[in-house]
């Protein structure tokens, strides 16, 4: 995987916010054969629950949520064609394997910088589960949004390789 092109590819895709409550509802839709709020195949999910937008902005503070909370749902969505996930923190081995198996990628966004991140999201539209408030599913457009390729489709894992590189032996 060319890590530089992976990030630029996200800017060409639809990016959807989805956290715990939305993932639970999406899973129920799949299990019940109900329509999904968006096409999973080829999509990117940003684990975030943005705040209300201030005047002149498309979105409020929009920092990443801890991704491991979605690990129970991620392999299923990756097997349905999800191409990218964006969040913070490590992923389970089951998710890492599903990323490899499906040719997907996991990006980390900068935690604690949600107020700055909103400046890189010029478009935001609530598309599903409006009753969930900040956890509703939103369609976003990223523009120069800072991302780090953290787990790639060939087994690269920055969390593991970083520890190996800096771990003292002996």
Residues covered by each model-derived region:
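Single conserved hydrophobic/aromatic residue that forms the stacking wall/gate
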Residues: 1-7, 11
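Short, charged beta-turn/beta-strand-edge "cap" motif at the junction between a beta-strand
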Residues: 9, 14-18, 153
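Short hydrophobic-aromatic micro-motifs
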Residues: 9-11, 46-47, 149
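Feature captures the catalytic cores and cofactor-binding loops of soluble hydro-lyases/lyases
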Residues: 17-145
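Active-site/ligand-binding-proximal alpha/beta "capping" segment
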Residues: 73-74, 150-170
């Amino acid at each position: 995987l060319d890590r530089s092109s992976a990030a630029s590819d996200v800017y060409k895709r639809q990016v959807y916010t989805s956290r715990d409550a939305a993932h639970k509802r999406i899973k129920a839709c799949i299990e019940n054969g109900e329509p999904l709020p968006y096409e999973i195949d080829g999509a990117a999910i940003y684990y975030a629950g943005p705040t209300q937008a201030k005047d002149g902005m498309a979105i409020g503070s929009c920092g990443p949520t801890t991704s491991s909370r979605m690990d129970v749902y991620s392999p299923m969505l990756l097997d349905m064609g999800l191409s990218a996930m964006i969040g913070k923190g490590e992923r389970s081995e089951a998710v890492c394997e599903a990323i490899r198996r499906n040719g997907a990628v996991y990006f980390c966004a900068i935690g604690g910088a949600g107020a700055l991140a909103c400046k890189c999201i010029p478009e935001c539209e609530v598309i599903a589960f409006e009753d969930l408030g900040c956890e509703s599913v939103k369609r976003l457009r990223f523009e120069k949004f800072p991302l780090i390729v953290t787990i790639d489709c060939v087994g690269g894992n920055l969390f593991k390789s970083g520890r190996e590189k800096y771990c003292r032996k002996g």
